[in-house]
Design a protein with these regions (language model features):
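Beta-strand/loop-rich accessory regions of lumenal/periplasmic or secreted enzymes
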Residues: 2-310
């Protein structure tokens, strides 16, 4: 099938997948995995695992000193394990319900649309539990808006971060972004300058103990480049407001498990996390002082953010 840049989307109702295809892009959503299973842009696959909500960043020396991990440690478990409890599909604004087999048999032949939307609702394993809703909205141009909504719940401890984690198949060659210079956090960005910056080394900051690092605040867009039979680039843009992100070769859990840098595995993936909320890192001292109240993230309040995969 030949598509034009502004032509209709081809929608495929699989038994256990929902596909949206167009000129130079393919998106596949897995009902079994509970998320976006594949992003292919110009023949390059960008996903190794389904993106999921993320609640945890690796601890810092200041976190350990203040005992933050003892108060909020359940968010690390929530970051690793969650239940996808609901999936809904809408095409051109018409609710299609959950069209897995055998309900998908009602769609015969090629199906085309101008917009497709699929929503996933995740339940956390925290006590008490709460929910996160993620909406993927694909436009006919191939741009995909991602809307993320965390539902606050009374009784939950403070969050380290809240965002979405994308695990990519190989280590990125570099990334370019427009935002604040250097490593920045909500309470550590006063000296940063706005600009466009190129980062061609995804290594961790060489602290004595591997820990949280390389956050980039107030970002308007980021382009990640990787090699697969040539250079390929994936662009993520802010939607309503700027976002924070990190782009590292390790998950927070891998960093957490290492007490020395030589204990980290060889880099083999890109872990790209985009955040709607980030806790400060403190630094008043490392033996008990908490982050200032203004830089806490309440888990009892709703958090919403959105971005665009261009």
């Amino acid at each position: 099938m030949d598509y034009t840049n502004n032509g209709p989307l081809k929608v495929v109702y699989g038994d256990y997948t929902f596909g949206v295809h167009g000129s130079g892009f393919d998106y596949i959503f897995s009902y079994a995995q509970g998320g976006l299973e594949s992003i292919v842009k110009d023949g390059c696959e960008w996903l190794y695992r389904c993106p999921k909500p993320t609640f945890w960043r690796a601890l810092t020396d200041n976190d350990r000193g203040s005992g933050f991990h003892l108060k909020s440690g359940m968010w690390m478990a929530a970051d690793m394990f969650m239940k996808c409890k609901n999936i809904q599909v809408a095409v051109d604004g018409v609710d299609q319900g959950f069209p897995c087999a055998p309900q998908n048999n009602r769609y015969g032949g090629d199906v085309y649309a101008y917009e497709a939307k699929i929503s996933f609702v995740y339940e956390t394993i925290t006590v008490p539990s709460t929910e996160v809703k993620v909406d993927y909205i694909i436009e006919k141009s191939g741009r995909m808006k991602v809307e993320v909504h965390y539902f606050g719940k009374e009784g939950l401890p403070q969050l380290p971060v809240f965002g979405m984690r994308f695990l990519m198949p190989s280590v990125a060659e570099k990334y370019i972004y427009e935002g604040l210079s250097g490593e920045t956090y909500p309470d550590r960005k006063a000296g940063a300058s706005q600009g466009i910056f190129v980062i061609d080394d995804l290594s961790l900051t060489p602290y004595l103990v591997p820990q949280e690092c390389e956050m980039r605040m107030d970002t308007k867009w980021v382009e990640i480049t990787r090699v697969k039979q040539g250079l390929h680039t994936l662009r993520i843009e802010a939607n309503d407001s700027a976002f924070a992100f990190s782009c590292l070769p390790y998950t927070a859990e891998e960093i957490e498990n290492a007490t020395h840098h030589e204990e980290l595995p060889l880099p083999r993936r890109t872990v790209f996390c985009i955040y709607g909320a980030v806790r400060g890192v403190g630094g008043i001292d490392s033996w008990g002082s908490d982050v200032e109240d203004a830089y806490h993230i309440s888990a009892e309040k709703d958090i919403k953010f959105s971005f665009v995969i261009a």
